[in-house]
């Protein structure tokens, strides 16, 4: 909220290298231009407030960008402005720029000053909140889990503050070996937002830092507005390292609480939540060991019972049982094999006898034994037809027990009647009735 008047710069002969202006001339012209500017309403945050001789000297910072101006409140005006104004307050002021020629300094003379309306602050804060929410910076799925046991904790807090002491003391009570990297910053005033923002960047770049805690021990609404600074909040949201907000104000939560991965109600609460309690963890380990021991004991007992059951079975109670059962089975196989072998031998002997008989039947000697004779010529050829032995042909009659010599008288039709009753010779192609039995 501001009100300004535009003033045209007075024309003047431009200085040159040969005709430069004296410093006093330049200073006088600057003062003239500034005096013509008149008064203006400005809005900002008081970042410095100090009194001397009834007067107040301070600085006013822009709410959105990094810009600061000095101001002076004369004692005559001091009595007319609210008594509770001071560092950290957000105000609107009617100021008149003054340029001090002798020192070359510019300051704003405060003619009026009042608190910014709480409604205006809340409205501006709510607009920023809605913008950040629309960008997804408050989404739950952006929240990262804190490491179970951080190797090093980055702590951003005021130097020698109660918040620093609370975090260090309680964290070390829970886990004595925990390590910290502490970055001290202003936690209120015009430097706070910038210093906290830079500290987040420094710790986020440190590979040893596993989690970052921003801690302040509470404060009024005005003092906590620094933790709703847009640049600070966006830097916290972009931080790659899990971040914990421990500002410690329940009624008016700063925007930092909404983008942090974890919001702690107090610095003490933050310390307890970023490191585990060593006594609780030891107790859990002991309980786990006890459960594992009981389970292992139960399993061992179960296996022992199974082994005893197996040992009580016949197959394991007497190992000779296996040999005996196999011996009986082997005996049955041997007896069966002997029986089958005997049958095969007997069948073979029968077949051999039959073949021998058949061979004897087919043998020429067998024919001779039956009373027949073989008639051969002198050259040993068997005589088959009468015409082959004309009268006077020498013959040999081969009998079963020897041979006789004879001479043919030629073919004759006079065959003794007894010759017709001689047994017929067996067929020369006679074979055994059947082959070997399989």
Curated annotation (Swiss-Prot):
Lineage: Bacteria, Bacillati, Actinomycetota, Actinomycetes, Micrococcales
Main location: cytoplasm
GO molecular function annotations of the record: exodeoxyribonuclease VII activity; nucleic acid binding
Gene Ontology terms describing biological process: DNA catabolic process
HAMAP family: Exonuc_7_L
Subunit structure: Heterooligomer composed of large and small subunits.
EC supergroup of this enzyme: hydrolase
Region span, Disordered: 406-438
Pfam families: Exonuc_VII_L, tRNA_anti_2
Protein name per the record: Exodeoxyribonuclease 7 large subunit
Species, as recorded: Clavibacter sepedonicus (Clavibacter michiganensis subsp. sepedonicus)
Gene (name only): xseA
Keywords for this protein: Cytoplasm, Exonuclease, Hydrolase, Nuclease
